[in-house]
Amino acid sequence: MRIKLIAVGGKMPGWVEQGYNEYVKRMPRDMPLQLIEIPMPRRQKNADPHKLKIQEGESILQSLGSGDHVVALEVEGKSWSTPQLSQQMERWRMSGQDVALLVGGPDGLSDACRARANQQWSLSPLTLPHPLVRVLLAEQLYRAWTILQGHPYHRE
């Protein structure tokens, strides 16, 4: 199983790349975490945010494989504890499908992305900065994997 983090935006600060890559290196070979960055359209003064969100959504959907299990990261999604995430990860692994985690741009995910999603996951009711979400996701995925392996990284 491959996990794809499909995120709108690029040109992250060095600390984001360093933090994200630290956890990517720790992921097992049979469950690699791959980042797919979707370029953010230019946001000019009179740009229509709805049209930009649709454009971002089309690019996200083009990055998906036909058999991907899609998880949209949405504030309104279901909240999981880390042990619950590890259970989700085990179900994803057992399904044999690749997993695509979708992170929208500043205006969120398009309706088409939400419609394509098999699940919606909320990291927090707070609005989180997109750079931080990348690091947080990578760490939580690694932590969930360690729970499945009985590794002492996660402590209750």
Curated annotation (Swiss-Prot):
Keyword check for Transferase: yes
Cellular localization per UniProt: Cytoplasm
GO CC entries: cytoplasm
Pfam families: SPOUT_MTase
Catalysed reactions, as listed in the record: pseudouridine(1915) in 23S rRNA + S-adenosyl-L-methionine = N(3)-methylpseudouridine(1915) in 23S rRNA + S-adenosyl-L-homocysteine + H(+)
Binding site for S-adenosyl-L-methionine: 73, 104, 123-128
InterPro entries per the UniProt record, alphabetical: Alpha/beta_knot_MTases, RlmH-like, tRNA_m1G_MTases_N
EC nos: 2.1.1.177
Gene Ontology MF, one: rRNA (pseudouridine-N3-)-methyltransferase activity
Statement: the UniProt record of this protein carries the keyword Transmembrane helix: no
Keywords: Cytoplasm, Methyltransferase, rRNA processing, S-adenosyl-L-methionine, Transferase
Top EC class of this enzyme: transferase
Function: Specifically methylates the pseudouridine at position 1915 (m3Psi1915) in 23S rRNA.
Family membership noted in the UniProt record: Belongs to the RNA methyltransferase RlmH family.
Subunit structure: Homodimer.
Name of the protein described by the UniProt record: Ribosomal RNA large subunit methyltransferase H
Organism of origin: Hahella chejuensis (strain KCTC 2396)
Gene transcribed to yield this protein: rlmH
